[in-house]
C-alpha cells in the first residue's frame, strides 16, 4: 500500500466510528496527478445521491504537461465504487443518527488501484477536542519520561 494523502484534520474534528475501503472513478490525468501526490483531502465529504456515493471537496491538481484545451475541474465530484449493501447500510446509519461520511486516506493498493478509506464519523464538540489534545500531550510526556528513564 502506497499512501498518497491523509486527512489529518478529520482525526481531530471527528470521532471515527467505522471505516471502509472504496474505489474511485478517476480520469487518466487524475491518476497521473495522484502518482505525483498532487492531491489535497482537506474538507472532503461523501454524499449519497440516488443510490450512488460521490466524493466532494477533494482537490486533485492537474499536471503541468496537460494541454490547455483539456483541463479538468480540480474539485469535481468523483464517484465512489461501493457495493450496494454497504452503501445502503451506511446511508441508513448516517441519516438515522445524524452522522457524516468523510475520506481519511487516499492510497494505491497492491494492484495499483486508487482507493480511499472512508469513515462514518460523528463530530466532536469543543470540549472533546480539548480533551483529546490533553491526552495527546500526556502520552507524549509519558513516552519522553520512559525514554529518559531507560536511556540513562
UniProtKB/Swiss-Prot annotation:
GO terms for biological process: trans-translation. It is found in: Cytoplasm. Signal peptide: none annotated. GO terms for molecular function: RNA binding. Its main location: cytoplasm. The keyword Electron transport does not apply. InterPro entries: SmpB (IPR023620), SsrA-bd_prot (IPR000037), SsrA-bd_prot_CS (IPR020081). It comes from the Bacteria. GO terms for cellular component: cytosol. Keywords: Cytoplasm, RNA-binding. Required for rescue of stalled ribosomes mediated by trans-translation. Binds to transfer-messenger RNA (tmRNA), required for stable association of tmRNA with ribosomes. tmRNA and SmpB together mimic tRNA shape, replacing the anticodon stem-loop with SmpB. tmRNA is encoded by the ssrA gene; the 2 termini fold to resemble tRNA(Ala) and it encodes a 'tag peptide', a short internal open reading frame. During trans-translation Ala-aminoacylated tmRNA acts like a tRNA, entering the A-site of stalled ribosomes, displacing the stalled mRNA. Belongs to the SmpB family. This is SsrA-binding protein. It comes from Helicobacter pylori (strain J99 / ATCC 700824) (Campylobacter pylori J99).
Amino acid at each position: 500500500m502506497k499512501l498518497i494523502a491523509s486527512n489529518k484534520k478529520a482525526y481531530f474534528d471527528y470521532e471515527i466510528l467505522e471505516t471502509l475501503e472504496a474505489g474511485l472513478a478517476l480520469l487518466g490525468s487524475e491518476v497521473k496527478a495522484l502518482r505525483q501526490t498532487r492531491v489535497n483531502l482537506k474538507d472532503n465529504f461523501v454524499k449519497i445521491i440516488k443510490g450512488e456515493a460521490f466524493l466532494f471537496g477533494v482537490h486533485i491538481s492537474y499536471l503541468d504537461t496537460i494541454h490547455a484545451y483539456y483541463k479538468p475541474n480540480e474539485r469535481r465530484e468523483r464517484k465512489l465504487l461501493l457495493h450496494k449493501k454497504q452503501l445502503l447500510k451506511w446511508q441508513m446509519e448516517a441519516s438515522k443518527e445524524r452522522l457524516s461520511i468523510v475520506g481519511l486516506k487516499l492510497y494505491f493498493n497492491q494492484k495499483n488501484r486508487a482507493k480511499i478509506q472512508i469513515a462514518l464519523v460523528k463530530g466532536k464538540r469543543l470540549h472533546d477536542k480539548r480533551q483529546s489534545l490533553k491526552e495527546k500531550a500526556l502520552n507524549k510526556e509519558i513516552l519522553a519520561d520512559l525514554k529518559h528513564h531507560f536511556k540513562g
